[in-house]
A protein has these predicted regions:
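Active-site donor-binding segments of glycosyltransferases and PAPS-dependent sulfotransferases
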Residues: 15
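PAPS-dependent sulfotransferase catalytic core
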Residues: 1-12, 67-101, 147-195
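Conserved two-lobed SF2 helicase motor
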Residues: 26-32
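A general structural motif
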Residues: 24-26, 48-49
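PAPS-dependent sulfotransferase catalytic domain
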Residues: 33-126, 133-146
Length: 195
Protein backbone atom coordinates (compact mmCIF):
# COMPACT_ATOMS: atom_id res chain seq x y z
CA UNK A 1 0.00 0.00 0.00
CA UNK A 2 1.81 3.06 -1.26
CA UNK A 3 0.46 6.33 -2.70
CA UNK A 4 1.17 5.38 -6.32
CA UNK A 5 -0.57 2.00 -6.05
CA UNK A 6 -3.57 3.60 -4.35
CA UNK A 7 -3.86 6.13 -7.20
CA UNK A 8 -3.54 3.35 -9.79
CA UNK A 9 -6.22 1.29 -8.07
CA UNK A 10 -8.59 4.26 -7.72
CA UNK A 11 -8.10 5.14 -11.39
CA UNK A 12 -8.78 1.58 -12.51
CA UNK A 13 -11.95 1.27 -10.41
CA UNK A 14 -13.16 4.71 -11.50
CA UNK A 15 -12.59 3.76 -15.13
CA UNK A 16 -14.55 0.52 -14.73
CA UNK A 17 -17.33 2.36 -12.89
CA UNK A 18 -17.73 5.31 -15.21
CA UNK A 19 -21.31 6.40 -15.80
CA UNK A 20 -22.80 5.18 -19.06
CA UNK A 21 -26.35 6.53 -18.65
CA UNK A 22 -27.53 9.74 -16.99
CA UNK A 23 -29.69 7.89 -14.48
CA UNK A 24 -26.80 5.79 -13.13
CA UNK A 25 -25.81 6.89 -9.65
CA UNK A 26 -24.74 3.80 -7.71
CA UNK A 27 -22.41 0.94 -8.50
CA UNK A 28 -21.62 -2.33 -6.79
CA UNK A 29 -18.20 -3.91 -7.18
CA UNK A 30 -17.91 -7.61 -6.46
CA UNK A 31 -14.46 -8.87 -5.57
CA UNK A 32 -13.48 -12.53 -5.55
CA UNK A 33 -12.86 -14.16 -2.20
CA UNK A 34 -9.09 -13.82 -2.15
CA UNK A 35 -9.40 -10.06 -2.64
CA UNK A 36 -10.51 -10.00 1.01
CA UNK A 37 -6.79 -10.23 1.81
CA UNK A 38 -6.54 -6.68 0.42
CA UNK A 39 -9.36 -5.28 2.58
CA UNK A 40 -7.15 -2.64 4.21
CA UNK A 41 -5.71 -1.56 0.84
CA UNK A 42 -9.20 -1.27 -0.69
CA UNK A 43 -10.40 0.74 2.31
CA UNK A 44 -7.34 3.04 2.06
CA UNK A 45 -8.19 3.71 -1.59
CA UNK A 46 -11.91 4.24 -0.95
CA UNK A 47 -12.30 5.12 2.75
CA UNK A 48 -15.87 6.42 2.43
CA UNK A 49 -17.27 3.50 0.44
CA UNK A 50 -19.28 1.00 2.49
CA UNK A 51 -18.35 -2.67 2.19
CA UNK A 52 -20.18 -5.94 2.68
CA UNK A 53 -18.46 -9.31 3.10
CA UNK A 54 -20.77 -12.04 1.85
CA UNK A 55 -19.56 -15.34 3.23
CA UNK A 56 -20.65 -18.89 2.58
CA UNK A 57 -20.16 -22.18 4.38
CA UNK A 58 -16.58 -23.15 3.41
CA UNK A 59 -17.71 -26.71 2.66
CA UNK A 60 -20.04 -25.40 -0.03
CA UNK A 61 -17.29 -23.22 -1.50
CA UNK A 62 -14.82 -26.13 -1.54
CA UNK A 63 -17.38 -28.36 -3.28
CA UNK A 64 -17.91 -25.63 -5.88
CA UNK A 65 -14.18 -25.39 -6.49
CA UNK A 66 -14.02 -29.12 -7.13
CA UNK A 67 -16.92 -28.85 -9.60
CA UNK A 68 -15.45 -25.85 -11.42
CA UNK A 69 -11.77 -25.27 -10.70
CA UNK A 70 -11.05 -21.75 -9.50
CA UNK A 71 -7.94 -19.60 -9.56
CA UNK A 72 -7.20 -20.34 -5.90
CA UNK A 73 -6.76 -24.03 -6.69
CA UNK A 74 -4.74 -23.25 -9.81
CA UNK A 75 -2.41 -21.19 -7.60
CA UNK A 76 -1.83 -24.19 -5.32
CA UNK A 77 1.69 -24.91 -6.58
CA UNK A 78 2.83 -21.29 -6.75
CA UNK A 79 4.36 -18.93 -4.21
CA UNK A 80 1.05 -17.11 -4.23
CA UNK A 81 -0.47 -20.06 -2.36
CA UNK A 82 1.53 -19.13 0.76
CA UNK A 83 -0.05 -15.67 0.69
CA UNK A 84 -3.55 -17.02 0.05
CA UNK A 85 -3.40 -19.64 2.79
CA UNK A 86 -1.42 -17.49 5.21
CA UNK A 87 1.04 -20.31 5.76
CA UNK A 88 4.49 -21.55 4.75
CA UNK A 89 5.56 -23.65 1.79
CA UNK A 90 6.49 -26.48 4.17
CA UNK A 91 3.02 -26.46 5.74
CA UNK A 92 1.41 -26.30 2.29
CA UNK A 93 3.37 -29.33 1.10
CA UNK A 94 1.76 -31.43 3.83
CA UNK A 95 -1.80 -30.38 2.91
CA UNK A 96 -4.20 -32.03 0.51
CA UNK A 97 -6.46 -29.78 -1.59
CA UNK A 98 -9.24 -29.65 1.00
CA UNK A 99 -6.83 -28.62 3.76
CA UNK A 100 -5.28 -26.01 1.45
CA UNK A 101 -8.65 -24.53 0.48
CA UNK A 102 -9.83 -24.60 4.10
CA UNK A 103 -6.66 -22.80 5.14
CA UNK A 104 -7.28 -20.15 2.46
CA UNK A 105 -10.87 -19.55 3.59
CA UNK A 106 -9.87 -19.42 7.25
CA UNK A 107 -7.23 -16.83 6.30
CA UNK A 108 -9.79 -14.73 4.38
CA UNK A 109 -12.18 -14.79 7.35
CA UNK A 110 -9.41 -13.86 9.76
CA UNK A 111 -8.33 -10.86 7.67
CA UNK A 112 -11.91 -9.61 7.34
CA UNK A 113 -12.58 -10.00 11.05
CA UNK A 114 -9.39 -8.00 11.80
CA UNK A 115 -10.03 -5.32 9.13
CA UNK A 116 -10.50 -1.75 10.33
CA UNK A 117 -13.15 -0.74 9.86
CA UNK A 118 -14.70 -4.16 9.65
CA UNK A 119 -17.00 -4.64 6.66
CA UNK A 120 -20.61 -5.51 7.29
CA UNK A 121 -20.94 -9.30 7.38
CA UNK A 122 -23.68 -11.29 5.69
CA UNK A 123 -24.15 -15.04 5.46
CA UNK A 124 -24.98 -16.33 1.99
CA UNK A 125 -27.86 -18.25 3.59
CA UNK A 126 -29.42 -14.93 4.68
CA UNK A 127 -29.05 -13.36 1.25
CA UNK A 128 -32.61 -13.78 -0.01
CA UNK A 129 -35.07 -11.73 -2.10
CA UNK A 130 -37.32 -10.86 0.84
CA UNK A 131 -34.30 -9.55 2.80
CA UNK A 132 -32.73 -7.55 -0.02
CA UNK A 133 -34.26 -4.19 0.85
CA UNK A 134 -33.08 -4.44 4.48
CA UNK A 135 -29.63 -5.66 3.44
CA UNK A 136 -29.11 -2.74 1.04
CA UNK A 137 -30.28 -0.24 3.65
CA UNK A 138 -28.13 -1.68 6.46
CA UNK A 139 -24.96 -2.31 4.45
CA UNK A 140 -24.99 0.60 2.00
CA UNK A 141 -27.63 3.08 3.23
CA UNK A 142 -29.24 2.50 -0.17
CA UNK A 143 -32.96 2.48 -0.87
CA UNK A 144 -33.65 1.39 -4.46
CA UNK A 145 -36.90 2.44 -6.11
CA UNK A 146 -39.52 -0.19 -6.98
CA UNK A 147 -38.25 -0.64 -10.54
CA UNK A 148 -34.66 -1.23 -9.37
CA UNK A 149 -35.80 -3.55 -6.62
CA UNK A 150 -37.90 -5.57 -9.07
CA UNK A 151 -34.88 -5.95 -11.37
CA UNK A 152 -32.75 -7.10 -8.43
CA UNK A 153 -35.41 -9.61 -7.35
CA UNK A 154 -35.49 -11.06 -10.87
CA UNK A 155 -31.80 -11.88 -10.57
CA UNK A 156 -32.45 -14.12 -7.58
CA UNK A 157 -34.18 -16.65 -9.79
CA UNK A 158 -31.14 -17.01 -12.07
CA UNK A 159 -27.83 -18.81 -11.52
CA UNK A 160 -25.32 -16.00 -10.97
CA UNK A 161 -22.63 -17.42 -13.26
CA UNK A 162 -24.92 -17.66 -16.28
CA UNK A 163 -24.40 -14.43 -18.23
CA UNK A 164 -27.36 -15.27 -20.48
CA UNK A 165 -29.75 -15.58 -17.51
CA UNK A 166 -31.11 -18.91 -18.73
CA UNK A 167 -30.16 -21.23 -15.88
CA UNK A 168 -32.52 -21.15 -12.94
CA UNK A 169 -31.12 -20.88 -9.43
CA UNK A 170 -31.59 -23.83 -7.12
CA UNK A 171 -30.30 -24.30 -3.59
CA UNK A 172 -27.51 -26.87 -3.74
CA UNK A 173 -26.26 -26.59 -0.17
CA UNK A 174 -27.15 -30.17 0.78
CA UNK A 175 -25.71 -31.71 -2.39
CA UNK A 176 -22.45 -29.81 -1.88
CA UNK A 177 -22.11 -31.18 1.64
CA UNK A 178 -22.62 -34.67 0.25
CA UNK A 179 -19.73 -34.25 -2.21
CA UNK A 180 -17.10 -34.20 0.55
CA UNK A 181 -16.15 -37.15 2.70
CA UNK A 182 -16.67 -37.05 6.47
CA UNK A 183 -12.91 -36.62 6.91
CA UNK A 184 -12.90 -33.62 4.60
CA UNK A 185 -15.94 -32.12 6.32
CA UNK A 186 -14.11 -32.40 9.65
CA UNK A 187 -10.99 -30.86 8.10
CA UNK A 188 -12.91 -27.84 6.82
CA UNK A 189 -14.53 -27.46 10.25
CA UNK A 190 -11.12 -27.73 11.96
CA UNK A 191 -9.58 -24.90 9.87
CA UNK A 192 -12.57 -22.58 9.78
CA UNK A 193 -14.25 -23.21 13.16
CA UNK A 194 -12.98 -20.08 14.89
CA UNK A 195 -14.04 -17.82 12.05
Amino acid sequence: SNPLNLVRFRNLVNLLCRRRLDNEHDIFIKFISWNSLYADFIHAAFPDVPTLFLYRDPVEVIASVFRETSAVLLARDSRQAEFLAGTTAIELAAMDDVAYLSSCYAHYFSVILDAQPQPKLLSFAAFAPDALEKILAAAFALQPDRHQLRQMHEQFSVYSKDDRNQTGFKDDSQSKHELLSDDHLRLAEQYCRGN
